[in-house]
C-alpha cells in the first residue's frame, strides 16, 4: 500500500493537514472512512508519538481497525475493546477481548509508540490506577534473584489462579523449584529456580507439559484488566460496607434480603482467593483514585476523534442506559448506591488539554473552539458489480482526466486476472512499481479497504473489489492471536476422581484416585476403583491399560457393575455381536461398491478453473483437501460414496457446489437432497448466485413451488433440460425420472425417515454420492472405518470468523433489554430461546412490552410445518427483528444477520445442545453474542452448576468445548452406524466400543492383528518403586507418567521420560530412580526374550523363553558376566534357560548389568 501513502504524502492538502494535526484543534471534513484512515495512517507513520483514535462504539472501532491494518504493522496497532453494554460487567469475560485490553494497557504503561483505537465506552471506563498497573508489569531474566513469595503474591494480584498443573490461561503452579505460568498473551512459560535465582526460563506445551525453547527474558502480563492487591481489598471492604449500609434503608423492604445476599456473595470477608471476574463489578469501590485510559497516554499523544456528533449521541444514550441499569440493579437488590462503571464527565472534559483533530464527513457545528478547518473533496466510487461496459467507461474517464488509478485486489492471482481484464478494455496498467507512478494509468496491487474513494483535487481514485465485483468479503490481515493454540482440545480422557471408568474384564466402575499401598513390605501405587455396593478393586498401575475412562452421552449415568458377576460378560457379548453385524454390513457394502461400474469423470475443465476462481473467499486447507478427495473419487470408475463432515458454517456447501459443477460440465445431472424446505431454499439461492455466469439450469422442488412449476421441473429432469435440482423429500417420489443422473448430494441424511432412506438407497445405485453432515465424526471411529467408508473432514473454521462472545449471567430484564437494543441498533436480528411451548406467546408479549418497536415472531415444534416454514423464511428475509423460539433452531438454519442469541434457563440444556445453538450466531463478519441466562437466586443442581462453569470455558477452548465435542462425537457415531448403536456405545463406553468395532472390521477384512513378537515380561522385585505424592501431587500427571512408563520399549524413551520428570517436577527421589531402573531392566528383558524376573528374597530368578534360549550365545554370555562371579548360576528347565542371581550389596546394579549382558549375547537371527 506504499503507493497510496506516497501519493497522499506528496499532496498539498495533506501537507496542510499534517502541519496542524496534533498541534491545534482542527476540524477535517469531507473524507470517507477509507480516505480518512489513509490520512491518519500516514500522519502516524510520520510522527514519533502515540496516536489515540476515538470512535463512538466498538463496531466502528473494528471497521477502522480492519482498514488501518493495511497500512500499519499489527504489532503497532492496538484496540481497547469494550462492549457498548453494561451487562458485560456482570458476566463472565471473554478471554479474547480481555487479552486485547491488557495488551493495550500494557503497551501504554510501558510508553510504547502505537496507534490506539478506543471506543467511547472504553474512554470513560474506570480502570486500575496507572501507577499500580505499572508496578505490576514484570520482566523476568535468567540469573536474576526473586523473592518467591512476593512474586507469587503479585501473580494472584494480577488475576492468576494457583493450580496443581497449569492447563488453562490465567493459571500458575509451583512444584519444587519450578513455577509454571500461562499468561493471557504469549506462550505458557516455565521458570526453574536455583534457591532464589532464576536458573532458566523455558516456554512449554500445555498439551504435553514438556519444555520447548530456552528464553533469556520474559514479560508477564496480568491475567485480568484489574489489579487487586490486599490494600485494594481492604479499601473495597470498607467502601462496600458503607455502600451496603447506605443502600439498605433506601430500597423496598421486599428486596433487602436480596441485597444482603448480593453483599455476602462477594465473599470478601472469608476468602483468600478473589475472583476478578466477579469483583470487576465493584470497580467504583476498589480504588481510592481510579484512572481512565486517557491517563495512561503520554502527555504529547496525538488525538483524533471520529465523528464528534455521533460520539455525543452515543454518550447521551450511554449515560441514560448506565443510569437506568444502575437504578435497576439497586431496586432489585443486586447493586449498591454509588456503584458505577464509567466516569460521568463529558467526553470533551476527558480529553481537555490535548489539541484534538476532529474528522467529520459533513461540515457541522460543534461546541468547541476550533483553530483550523480543512475541507477535502472526496467522492464515493461507482459500484460496477461486474458490469463490463460501465467499468470500461469509468476507467476510460479516469485515464482521460489523467488520474492516478489504484486498484486493490485481495490475492495475487486476482492481480493477474485484473490486469488481463484492463488490457481487454485498453486501459494501461502496471502491477510492479519502480520509484514513481505516472498518472493516466492504473496500478494493480494486493490489498483491501472497506470501500474505494475518489479525491478529485489530488487526481487520485482508489477502487476495491467491493466496487468491482460486489465482493462479499474483505480480507483482514491476520492479527497475531492473543491466545495461543496450545489450548486445543486436550484429551477428554483426563481422569478425575469420581469419573466412571471401564475395566476390560470387570466392567463399569468409578475411579477413586491413586493410592500407595504397602504389600509385603514394599510400597506400590494402585488405581482404586469402586464397583456396585461396597466392592472395591485395586489395579496395579502397570496394568492400567485395562482401564479406560467411560465416555458416553452427556445425560447418561451408567450402571455400576458387580465385581465377579456375569452381567459384564453378557453385556460385552451383546455388543460384540452387534459390532460384528455392522462390520459385516459395511464390508459387504464396500465390496459391492468396489465391483460396481460408475461414470468416470475426466480432469478439470477450463470452465471449472474459472468457476472456482470466482469464489470470493480463500479456501481453508481442509476444504481444499476435501475437494481434491471428492474429485479423485469422481475420476475413478467405481461410484463415489463419500461422507463430508464439518461444523455449521465451515464451508461444506462450497465443496458440494464444486462437485456439482464438475458433474454438470460433463453433461450429468445433479440432485441435491435436503431435509427441510428452508434449507432447500437457501442451497438453491447459493447455487443460483455461484453459477449465475455459467449456462447451468437450476431448479427447486419444495412446497414453495406451485404444482405447475414442479411439473415443469419434472419434465426438465426427464428431457435433460434441468442440470441441477435442489429439493426436499419431494425429489424421492417415484414419478421423478432423470435423463442422466450423475451425482446425488444428500445433506444431513440422518434427518430423513426410514422410508425416505430406503428410497435414497435405490437412487444411490451406480451414481456418485456425497453426503454432508454437521455432526462431527469421532477420530477413533474414523480410523476404524478406514477402507470401508470414505470420509472427508473440515475441521478448520474459515478465516476471520470472530469467536462468539459468550456471557453467562443471571436472568434480569434490564440485561435482556440492553442485549436486544444493542443488536437491533446495528440492524441485526435476535434468536430468543425459550423452551416452554405452553407459555411462549406470553414471553413474546413480555418482550414486546420491553421493545415496543420491534417485530417479534414465534417458532415452535407444535406449529404446522407450513406455518413454521413461513415464519422462519420471513425471519431469514429480515421481516422480523426477534424470533422467540424453542430448540427447533438447533439444526441447519442459516441467518447470517442474526448475531445475538439469548437462552433462558441455560442450566437446563445439555452442553452439546448449547454448543450447537451457539453456532447459530457469529456466522458473518460481525461479532456474535450469546447470553446464557440462569434464574436469579435459584439454587442450581450440582450438574447444572458444573455445566454453567463449563459453558464459561466455552470460549472455543475449555472443558465445556471438550464435553460438547465428546457428546456430538457420540451422536455422530450413532448417525453413522445406526440409532441402536447409540445404546451399545452407552453400555460399554465409547473407547471400548471403537476398539471392538475396529477389531471386528479388521477380522472381517482378513487383516490379522500383528502378533506381538516380544512376549510379555513380568518383573517382580521387592523394592519401593513408585511416584510419591510429595514428588508429583497431581493425580492426572501421575497416571500420565505411569502410562508412558508402561509403554516404554527403548532406551531413548527412558531418557526422554527422565528429562520430562526433571523438566516438569525437578530432581527425583530414590523411589522414582528405582522405578526407572525397573523400567530399564524391563526394556533389556523385552529385547532378549526374558519372560520372568522374580525376587525370591535372597535370590532373583530369571527365566528365558525357549526361542531366546536357542538364540543365546553361551560363550559370549559367560565371558561378559565374569565380574558377577559365583553370584550367578545357570540352569535349564523345560528346554528354557534359567539364571539365578544371589543378592548382595548393590544387587539392583548387578541385575541391570546381567540383563544387559543377556541382551548383548543374543545372536542376530538371519531370517531378516
From Swiss-Prot:
A Gene Ontology cellular-component term: cytoplasm
SMART domains xref list: CarD_TRCF (SM01058), DEXDc (SM00487), HELICc (SM00490), TRCF (SM00982)
Gene: mfd
Broad enzyme group: hydrolase
Function summary: Couples transcription and DNA repair by recognizing RNA polymerase (RNAP) stalled at DNA lesions. Mediates ATP-dependent release of RNAP and its truncated transcript from the DNA, and recruitment of nucleotide excision repair machinery to the damaged site.
Motif DEEQ box, residue numbers: 747-750
Record lineage: Bacteria, Bacillati, Bacillota, Bacilli, Bacillales
Biological process (GO), any one: transcription-coupled nucleotide-excision repair, DNA damage recognition
Keyword Signal belongs to the record: no
NCBIfam families hit by this protein: mfd
Domain of life from the UniProt record: Bacteria
Molecular-function GO terms, alphabetical: ATP binding; damaged DNA binding; DNA helicase activity; hydrolase activity
Binding site residues for ATP: 646-653
Compartments reported by the entry: Cytoplasm
InterPro entries per the UniProt record, alphabetical: CarD-like/TRCF_RID, CarD-like/TRCF_RID_sf, DEAD/DEAH_box_helicase_dom, Helicase_ATP-bd, Helicase_C-like, Mfd, MFD_D3, P-loop_NTPase
Domain Helicase C-terminal: start-end pairs: 808-969
Family: In the N-terminal section; belongs to the UvrB family.
EC number(s) on file: 3.6.4.-
Domain Helicase ATP-binding: 633-794
Keyword terms, alphabetized: ATP-binding, Cytoplasm, DNA damage, DNA repair, DNA-binding, Helicase, Hydrolase, Nucleotide-binding
Keyword Cytoplasm in record: yes
Protein name: Transcription-repair-coupling factor
